[in-house]
């Protein structure tokens, strides 16, 4: 029988976290990136940032980092940041679904937390609320989730 893992009690100080951030919708993604970096650095973590052109390019980099981490156990988690704004066609929906499915498969295959904060949003107002707000920033939430998952994985 597995013992119950209480991640709050397992201390993960430091660690190395990769952040993959899209260059598309830079204003919003950069705000999430700054917030995530700040949260991770506050926890004593080392942060590696990789910038990619758009959200669709995030999974291939996540897969490469996850595979390399499987070989040398260097990363505690991979955080993926992007903003996709819906338009008049279904293009954004297709990109969002492809990214979501790929990131889920990567974390299952490589057994490394892949934190999905590639936001599929209706409009710029939603982007402002989720990325630029002082009280609410998805970059901060992504970093907190990554730290929590690092604790969980270390405890297994």
Annotate the PLM regions.
Residues 1, 5-13, 67-77:
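Short, basic, low-complexity termini and linkers enriched in Ser/Thr/Gly/Pro
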Residues 8-52:
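Glycine-rich phosphate/diphosphate-binding loop of Rossmann-like nucleotide-binding domains
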Residues 15, 92-156:
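C-terminal binding/interaction regions
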Residues 23-24, 52-55, 83-84, 119-124:
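Short, ordered loop/turn segments at secondary-structure junctions
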Residues 26, 34, 41-46, 63-67, ...:
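Generic secondary-structure signature for well-ordered alpha-helical cores
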Residues 49-64:
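N-terminal beta-loop-helix "entrance" segment that forms/cooperates
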Residues 61-69, 74-103, 107:
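Glycine-rich phosphate-binding loop
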């Amino acid at each position: 029988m597995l013992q119950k893992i209480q991640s709050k009690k397992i201390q993960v100080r430091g660690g190395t976290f990769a952040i993959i951030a899209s260059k598309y919708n830079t204003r919003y993604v950069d705000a999430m990136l700054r917030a995530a970096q700040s949260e991770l650095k506050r926890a004593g973590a080392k942060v590696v940032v990789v910038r990619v052109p758009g959200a669709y390019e995030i999974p291939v980099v996540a897969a490469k980092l996850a595979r390399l981490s499987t070989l040398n156990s260097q990363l505690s988690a991979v955080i993926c940041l992007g903003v996709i704004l819906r338009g008049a066609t279904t293009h954004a929906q297709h990109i969002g679904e492809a990214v979501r499915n790929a990131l889920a498969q990567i974390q299952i295959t490589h057994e490394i937390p892949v934190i999905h904060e590639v936001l599929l949003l209706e409009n710029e107002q939603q982007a402002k609320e989720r990325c630029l707000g002082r009280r609410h920033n998805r970059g901060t939430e992504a970093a907190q989730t990554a730290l929590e998952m690092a604790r969980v994985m270390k405890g297994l």
